[in-house]
């Protein structure tokens, strides 16, 4: 039986000049330790659902695997909080290459500040997906409506893999990076072609979020929040359209505005 993704607790709410006791729903935090070929690799603090997708997506994002068939055996013991991954390759992982984040310039045309493993795994988008303004806003609305966990707790981030007119998969997590890793794992497990897909996201587009999207292989990210300057620089270099502040009836296009399609 899986862990509960929410927990109930009695709280006191201040409203209209008085404290009133009521029951509230909170998002559950779950530490999951990932063992790779018998060695401890990482502990992810996450929402306890879609855990196989999370682990596989995280390992792909870190460059440990590229395809699901590189995993020989996968098991999760939720009672202990462990995921066990046996790879087809028995080559010993150099953990320092993955856990030590080294910031520096990438080889090539002076790319900006990639982490060591990101140089190997970030993909430059080949096909630039186009989308109408109406569908940009529709996808954001649809994602927000679909997240029951967010509506119950207000304590999670949402991410959706989409075509240009509909949601394909939506994942929620207390960690914004985890939500994206769950989508990556979903794509690998179900062998979803991603070159013509985009990601709709509830949080800020930081450089790490942008890199997660690049590793998945999509060519557009739509967020209801703001991007950072470094994320925009990376998006230009990786050929990814970035849209922020997608709310109500408006949004900002930060890179590749030519892909907004007017009828």
Curated annotation (Swiss-Prot):
The keyword Cytoplasm applies. GO terms for biological process: Mo-molybdopterin cofactor biosynthetic process. InterPro entries: Cytidine_deaminase-like, FdhD. It is found in: Cytoplasm. GO terms for molecular function: sulfur carrier activity; sulfurtransferase activity. It holds the Pfam family FdhD-NarQ. One of its GO terms (cellular component) is cytoplasm. Keywords: Cytoplasm, Molybdenum cofactor biosynthesis. The keyword Cytoplasm applies. The active site is at residue 107. HAMAP family: FdhD (MF_00187). Belongs to the FdhD family. Required for formate dehydrogenase (FDH) activity. Acts as a sulfur carrier protein that transfers sulfur from IscS to the molybdenum cofactor prior to its insertion into FDH. This is Sulfur carrier protein FdhD. It comes from Bacillus licheniformis (strain ATCC 14580 / DSM 13 / JCM 2505 / CCUG 7422 / NBRC 12200 / NCIMB 9375 / NCTC 10341 / NRRL NRS-1264 / Gibson 46). The gene is fdhD.
